[in-house]
């Protein structure tokens, strides 16, 4: 299944369907869920990153339970905006995941999303390092998905 842009994903969604945002990290995959009006992204949770078939099965369960019609994953572009090895690996992973889950997918620039979330948690929430680690993945997914929703709002 090919990757789509955000406008195409929005156009493919059925009535009352949501988007599931993914922020894949080394150990975990942060998850965020849009509302059905595609205006607001909320943190949803995190999955342990492992075998693709196991991750895909869990995402299929979440998609069925929450009415998800498409996936949006973070795209780790280089700081200068170039498409490097990390972006290529993320793209390949997302194409494979989309095929296994059976949902259309798009990717969105995630540069600095984790940094922005960490900064907010340190400055505004005064959280311990351990508590921040528990929250940062799903909050980064929400931050990335919200950026995609805002940039493509109609």
UniProtKB/Swiss-Prot annotation:
Calcium listed as a keyword: no
GO terms under cellular component: cytosol
Keyword annotations: Cytoplasm, Hydrolase, Nuclease, Ribosome biogenesis
One Gene Ontology molecular-function label: nuclease activity
Purpose: Could be a nuclease involved in processing of the 5'-end of pre-16S rRNA.
Pfam families found in the cross-reference section: RuvX (PF03652)
Superkingdom of the organism of origin: Bacteria
Sequence similarity: Belongs to the YqgF nuclease family.
Subcellular location: Cytoplasm
Entry EC no(s): 3.1.-.-
Main localization (coarse): cytoplasm
Gene Ontology biological process terms in this record: rRNA 5'-end processing
Stated name of the protein: Putative pre-16S rRNA nuclease
């Amino acid at each position: 299944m090919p990757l789509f842009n955000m406008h195409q994903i929005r156009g493919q969604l059925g009535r009352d369907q949501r988007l599931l945002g993914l922020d894949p990290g080394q150990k975990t995959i942060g998850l965020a869920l849009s509302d059905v009006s595609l205006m607001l992204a909320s943190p949803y949770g995190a999955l342990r990153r492992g075998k693709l078939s196991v991750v895909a099965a869990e995402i299929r369960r979440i998609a069925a339970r929450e009415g998800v019609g498409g996936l949006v994953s973070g795209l780790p572009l280089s700081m200068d905006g170039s498409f490097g090895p990390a972006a290529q690996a993320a793209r390949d992973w997302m194409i494979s995941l989309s095929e296994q889950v059976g949902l259309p997918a798009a990717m969105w620039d995630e540069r600095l999303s984790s940094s922005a979330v960490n900064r907010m948690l340190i400055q505004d929430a005064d959280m311990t390092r351990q508590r921040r680690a528990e929250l940062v993945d799903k909050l980064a997914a929400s931050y990335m998905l919200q950026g995609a929703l805002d940039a493509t709002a109609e």
